[in-house]
Amino acid sequence: MEIENEQICTCIAQILHLLNSLIITFLDDDKTETGQSFVYIDGFLVKKHNNQHTIVNFETYKNKMKVSDRRKFEKANFDEFESALNNKNDLVHCPSITLFESIPTEVRSFYEDEKSGLIKVVKFRTGAMDRKRSFEKIVVSVMVGKNVQKFLTFVEDEPDFQGGPIPSKYLIPKKINLMVYTLFQVHTLKFNRKDYDTLSLFYLNRGYYNELSFRVLERCYEIASARPNDSSTMRTFTDFVSGTPIVRGLQKSTIRKYGYNLAPYMFLLLHVDELSIFSAYQASLPGEKKVDTERLKRDLCPRKPTEIKYFSQICNDMMNKKDRLGDILHIILRACALNFGAGPRGGAGDEEDRSITNEEPIIPSVDEHGLKVCKLRSPNTPRRLRKTLDAVKALLVSSCACTARDLDIFDDNNGVAMWKWIKILYHEVAQETALKDSYRITLVPSSDGVSVCGKLFNREYVRGFYFACKAQFDNLWEELNDCFYMPTVVDIASLILRNREVLFREPKRGIDEYLENDSFLQMIPVKYREIVLPKLRRDTNKMTAALKNKVTVAIDELTVPLMWMIHFAVGYPYRYPELQLLAFAGPQRNVYVDDTTRRIQLYTDYNKNGSSEPRLKTLDGLTSDYVFYFVTVLRQMQICALGNSYDAFNHDPWMDVVGFEDPDQVTNRDISRIVLYSYMFLNTAKGCLVEYATFRQYMRELPKNAPQKLNFREMRQGLIALGRHCVGSRFETDLYESATSELMANHSVQTGRNIYGVDSFSLTSVSGTTATLLQERASERWIQWLGLESDYHCSFSSTRNAEDVVAGEAASSDHHQKISRVTRKRPREPKSTNDILVAGQKLFGSSFEFRDLHQLRLCHEIYMADTPSVAVQAPPGYGKTELFHLPLIALASKGDVKYVSFLFVPYTVLLANCMIRLSRCGCLNVAPVRNFIEEGCDGVTDLYVGIYDDLASTNFTDRIAAWENIVECTFRTNNVKLGYLIVDEFHNFETEVYRQSQFGGITNLDFDAFEKAIFLSGTAPEAVADAALQRIGLTGLAKKSMDINELKRSEDLSRGLSSYPTRMFNLIKEKSEVPLGHVHKIWKKVESQPEEALKLLLALFEIEPESKAIVVASTTNEVEELACSWRKYFRVVWIHGKLGAAEKVSRTKEFVTDGSMRVLIGTKLVTEGIDIKQLMMVIMLDNRLNIIELIQGVGRLRDGGLCYLLSRKNSWAARNRKGELPPIKEGCITEQVREFYGLESKKGKKGQHVGCCGSRTDLSADTVELIERMDRLAEKQATASMSIVALPSSFQESNSSDRCRKYCSSDEDSDTCIHGSANASTNATTNSSTNATTTASTNVRTSATTTASINVRTSATTTESTNSSTNATTTASTNVRTSATTTASINVRTSATTTESTNSNTSATTTESTDSNTSATTTESTDSNTSATTTASTNSSTNATTTASTNSSTNATTTESTNASAKEDANKDGNAEDNRFHPVTDINKESYKRKGSQMVLLERKKLKAQFPNTSENMNVLQFLGFRSDEIKHLFLYGIDVYFCPEGVFTQYGLCKGCQKMFELCVCWAGQKVSYRRMAWEALAVERMLRNDEEYKEYLEDIEPYHGDPVGYLKFFSVKRGEIYSQIQRNYAWYLAITRRRETISVLDSTRGKQGSQVFRMSGRQIKELYYKVWSNLRESKTEVLQYFLNWDEKKCREEWEAKDDTVFVEALEKVGVFQRLRSMTSAGLQGPQYVKLQFSRHHRQLRSRYELSLGMHLRDQLALGVTPSKVPHWTAFLSMLIGLFCNKTFRQKLEYLLEQISEVWLLPHWLDLANVEVLAADNTRVPLYMLMVAVHKELDSDDVPDGRFDILLCRDSSREVGE
């Protein structure tokens, strides 16, 4: 009877719980007549009105209710509401999860009032200090009275296990953690005031110690892993069950996380002598060993921690308790229970800690003695404590193993006592972790599932997720099937897996002896293995590089859905590392085929501790088929596509490298091959296993129909609960089966004892057969419950398309026909070696002779031999053109056959030069390739000449493919044949990274149609040549030998292709002569590159008036500026990549043919292929040139000459972009050329310098004479003091700003004139940058003018003056470092002035002077760099104003003297109206007091000095040195905390200005711009310079600084100069468009006119299309952002009906737009609220501009004669631009078509760019965003070939601006 009553009570309770969960349904259904409805939820009355749920007061609303509602709620208990009403705190705890699931929540900030101790909400008038101490909570707001608001926060109640039955089973036995007090005794670890000052060092430099700990652990682990093989250190497979390794395999990411967790404890060890908690150690007796902390700090430098021997000895001594060192380790282990702050985030394990929020680190408080002690507000959680102990154990084992002879101290039985104590601690913490599970599991019998933290998880959830992943797998398979005849999954399963003739009987791990290097692939007979690889389809007749890449990418993508299919199919879940390491071969193999059931079985061990025996899990038949198919078909395709040269994987400790005698000699290629043939789940692009970040992306989207998604840990707990309660195991009868299920999930090692009453049950307690049977039964139960087998037979249609079958059968014959076509010999006239000689005499005359035998041999090889493909590398100037020119003339002389050949060059500027050279003497008929593409073959032309873009164009490819048919129809003969395909400078295919996407179309070209392919270059060593040929789809260079297996695989890959290798002729190596020895090469460091270049050019033209020169500049802007400024001296031609093709050809031709043209200025595109006879000088101003660009540039000097490499002094070293060659280095140029070509080095030997470093022995007599004449002219100019005209002001401005940038915090340019002065011209003589002598002169570094004289930075000697930059002394003067002072003059930049003399930065003493850099003051002088003032003059490094003189660092002019070392203009003699004076507050007058130690005050002072302008409205661009007009267009508006990704500078409970604890705050009074804000902006600057992948890697690199914005700013400021240069370089085009308003014309974009109809439209047509698109969107109520993101035409009526921004954003959020945006695009690299906030306040100026233009749009519509339609309002317009910005496909297409723009990576820059105007084809102006919409529409249009998927790839975003 009692049992029945108990069951009845249980049922009633369950029913009540279900009714409570259905309350939300009543909220929608139970409505009153007034549109309102009320419902009671856990003590609160909830009102629903207009889809809004709010908590209301019953007493207030009861008179407004219907009578029935009022009666219903009158008896309700509103105790919870009354409790909230009476609570004095603003924040009130609420235990109702249903309430929080029903009512919208918000995030609010709260603080603890110091006076009352109450928790109050942060309001507008809350003080600054209270705001800094605030913390954030997720709350529900409640209006408890008039203007009285409370906030509810969810706090879960303790479940009452004593109060009778409860409707659900909670997994929270207890919540209070006393372990840190009882076991670790943390309350006895007290810190005094001195300790706190020491600990502040850690928090001030946490990033440093994070990096230090990681590097130390990494180094120790490397040494420990390299110990000789023994059972204690090296893991072997036979050691799998019987023992565990001491030094375990760790991935690098794990080592990094361990290192970050160890940072606080490494700090404690390094300061063991200073902290009072180590008092026991500090009281050691004389003679006992002490820790030399200074030596440790030196040895453990984080940049290179190689010296770890001493550290290892200390660790060994601590483990052995030598002297009192054991006390140190004892204290450190106890300190592990202290929470020193959040550890690193990321990875699978970190998801387990996501429920732990608002953790507070150790906070100091004052005890009764006035000492600061550690008050533990929140100790480490058990899970985090366990991770910390994991890290400590790893460090102790690795460090001790570095020097210990053996590792017996870690033995479980005979080890030292310290190790045993550590294991006890770890065991207790692990047990506590198991009990502290924070996930609430509730049974939901009605839906056959459970509720995990209020989220429903049942059978339908699992099946929906599983089949969504299966569908994704099938979709990717279909993409491969479009290119190949792919066998289906069912085909392979039926043919092999289900075929009983194929046996899979083999021993499995943990059962029988393991056989190394086995795989179930070896069990498959050879006859089956030969037919599994798919064949190419007929329309895809080439296995090009692009197709190979498509194969590898597709297989990488379908790996992730397969992982999820396995995860759900096994049922008893894996932790992610176990799933990640599944392997089908090798020593870590765990994937097998069961010979009986023909299902895949997985034998895995518990990866987390490696101590348990293997677990057997069996997959269902459907999943088994997919896994088998992946291994046998897809992985083998991937291996073939990657090729034998694939080497992306590095050796990682988690790999077991077997089969090599010396594992240290294993190359990356060997490792990659092992990984590909062993592990299942790989990311071949990155060279790593599939990362957890990639894996978990599916959880955010799938299953589609689930209202709430579970994270990975919740899903794991849910799967365990399903297996426990829903799969059908009964505790009474299936005792061992239930226990087996728990162990298969690795859920608890004590499950048998605690739950099932079995004493320490494990699978080893039963026989091996029984263990296998129990596990197979468990898997069978899960498979039956999930129902995957029922879908097995209908999951994949076994029938194939009849056409595919026929085509597949015919593929073999097609293949042989293709090969026969390629290998057949062409009918042609007999050739003779005499043909080449005759051709040479036609071209050069009867006296023609070859240069050497190499040239003769190569001409005969090209003309006579049957080699189908030839590559030639010859030095520049060798005569490579003749190598194909003579054979072409010989071919043209054949009468019976007409040969048509093609020549392609890299740049348009070479076209004119090539056509002139090749058409001379009338030997060949030459025409542009464009004629052939547009009109076809004319029957007359022998050679068509074009550029690489023509070679890659689809029209050219189609013309060649249809050649035979067209020729036969046009000329009625087959005697018109394709001759040579010649590609000049073919190294560009590999080295021009930013253009590689343009070359993709070349892979579609049928090379086999040509008689011969010839590739020429002067800079293509074997490695570059081989890679370049493979990039365009060819086989590559011929190898000396080929293995038979490799040959067979090559044939498989190249079905239907020509696999001829290219023969390489390397004339440079054959001749063994270093190229360019005939040119004199000089590297000069100068103050101003343009100024020095102008001097050199003027000198050259004075000596050789008829000569020519080439100047290579770095940017297009510089090209134009040089051309404008030099035009007054000589005739100039300038070229860069932004010119149209016709203009480039015209200008090049003009420079070559017009003898009056002197200088050709351009970017690096002018350095290749141009042949100019009168050229005598090449000057390079681009310090980013690589060795190839240098050789090409110098190679223009055919007969000798001078080459100058000019770089600016103190310039930052250029950094090579990803995939590019590094820039040339300072030093011997010839040695770098030798290294590039692979020639023997002569460094330090005779003959090292050839034409460089002052050597003239190898130069021609003419070149030597030219050098001597240039030298004599320079000496003559110096002697005669010839004045050279200054450069334009633009150069002076830029150079002066560059010089001042390192001294000034701002680059504000100001030209101020003061009474009695003139700029750059005075009554006296002025000498600039020359050695001049005058009577009375003053040297200054800026443009300062006085009545008496002007001094420049050179060595000028006068009677009454001072020499600068030298140690010269005059009658009444003093030498200073940069400025000289005389009786009537004062020098700038050092600011020390006296009546008779000045000493600055020297130790010179005069009669009436004081030395600078001190605080000394004399009667008539004051020293600089201090704030001292005297009667006569004032010199200081701050802004000082006196009667006699004033200091200034800008262009100031005075009557007598001016001194400058500060940034403001000078005020002299009351002439304030001519100057702008900016007063600066004296910091000494406004001193303030802040709490904190001296260490904090010192750090605060250092930071203030490093970032001095944070008291103003400073931004990071000012800090970098940009001018105000540049900042106006580059300014990073919209950058706030939400720009930062989650976890980066977003910690709570710390100072909001510096992210440090309040007691360690380094912010200072009056600081307007916080360090945290500057860190946000610095991060945005880094984003400006990186694409998505590079930025993601950068975020990983700065992980140590994620919680330390101050440390990050220090790290950022180190490379400020480099960043400044990069922005100037990469955004020069952007500033030209937005700042100077340069016009963008679509007609200047060659690719745009060729590849898009939009670029041929008029402005009217573009506008009509724009309005039509918006009209359609408005009519269909399409969601705008989603449409422009990926052309998805989803409906969202609420968006179009929204009246304000808030409602608009809510509508987007409701349909999940922002969620999809973050998961699908680069928006995921920002914070979760970043895109949403763009609709609020960030774009006010742009919004007002747009709204003002709405009237203009209406006028345009009326002018166009269309019906006026509503132009999109601002929010819709902004949605469009955001969608376009995140649409990667569209952006790549636009950037490819519109050549004047490049990629931008910040949304504000994109919005500004979208609003500039462009010239349409009819020269009418339209906004760029209209053109964007037109291109977007074209990509989605049906009349575009292949629709949206045939997208032309774009250039690399980091490309050079010039071309």
Swiss-Prot record:
Listed SMART domains: DEXDc, HELICc
Domain Helicase ATP-binding: 861-1038
GO cellular component: cytoplasm; nucleus
Gene3D superfamilies reported in the protein's UniProt record: P-loop containing nucleotide triphosphate hydrolases
Domain Helicase C-terminal: 1095-1244
Region (Disordered): 1318-1485
Pfam families according to UniProt: DEAD, Helicase_C, Sir1
Compositional bias of kind Low complexity: 1318-1461
Binding site for ATP: A874, P875, P876, G877, Y878, G879, K880, T881
Induction: Induced in absence of telomerase TLC1.
Described function: Catalyzes DNA unwinding and is involved in telomerase-independent telomere maintenance.
Similarity field: Belongs to the helicase family. Yeast subtelomeric Y' repeat subfamily.
Protein name: Y' element ATP-dependent helicase protein 1 copy 6
Organism per entry: Saccharomyces cerevisiae (strain ATCC 204508 / S288c) (Baker's yeast)
